[in-house]
């Protein structure tokens, strides 16, 4: 690895759910608390920003960039003036059926990378469970 300490955590998981089912769960931001409670306790539509999320009583604008044809959904928020960051999620066709879901998260300076990795693994497992039940 070059460039010092890692700045992101990326994991993937295989599922029997088709790409369309995974993207359907991801494209509905109100479902984020079901599978990613570490990110948001609640997400609601906001006429100004599109979406507003709440975590531990703090509200933040959330931009959801979805490309259903490409199987991508990104959840973005302002991390510094003029800069966005967040979760970058891809669902691709798995040979033989189902899909492979990959998510990349930024590593926060005050959070142990092992904790981020464990949270991401739980989130992916819950996400694919929801997609399989769709």
What does each model-identified segment do?
Residues 1-44:
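Hydrophobic ligand-binding cavity/cleft-lining segments
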Residues 8-10, 57-61, 83-88:
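Short, surface-exposed coil-to-beta transition loops
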Residues 12-16, 63, 90-92:
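Generic structural detector for well-ordered beta-strands
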Residues 18, 56, 69, 94-98:
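Short strand-connecting beta-turns/loops that link adjacent beta-strands
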Residues 22-26, 32, 51, 64, ...:
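Hydrophobic pocket/interface hotspot
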Residues 24-37, 70, 122-133:
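Short, intrinsically disordered, mixed-charge
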Residues 45-52, 68-76:
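Short, hydrophobic/aromatic-rich segments at coil-to-beta transitions
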Residues 76-134:
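Beta-strand/loop substructures that line and gate deep hydrophobic ligand-binding cavities in soluble
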């Amino acid at each position: 690895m070059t460039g010092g300490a890692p700045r992101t955590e990326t994991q993937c998981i295989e599922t029997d759910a088709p790409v369309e089912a995974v993207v359907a769960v991801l494209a509905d931001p109100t479902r984020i608390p079901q599978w990613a409670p570490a990110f948001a306790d609640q997400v609601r539509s906001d006429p100004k920003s599109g979406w507003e999320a709440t975590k531990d009583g703090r509200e933040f604008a959330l931009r959801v960039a979805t490309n259903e044809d490409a199987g991508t959904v990104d959840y973005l928020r302002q991390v510094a003036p003029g800069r966005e960051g967040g979760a970058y999620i891809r669902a691709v066709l798995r040979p033989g059926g189902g899909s492979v879901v990959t998510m990349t998260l930024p590593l926060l300076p005050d959070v142990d990378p092992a904790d981020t990795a464990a949270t991401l693994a739980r989130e992916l497992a819950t996400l694919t469970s929801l997609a399989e039940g769709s």
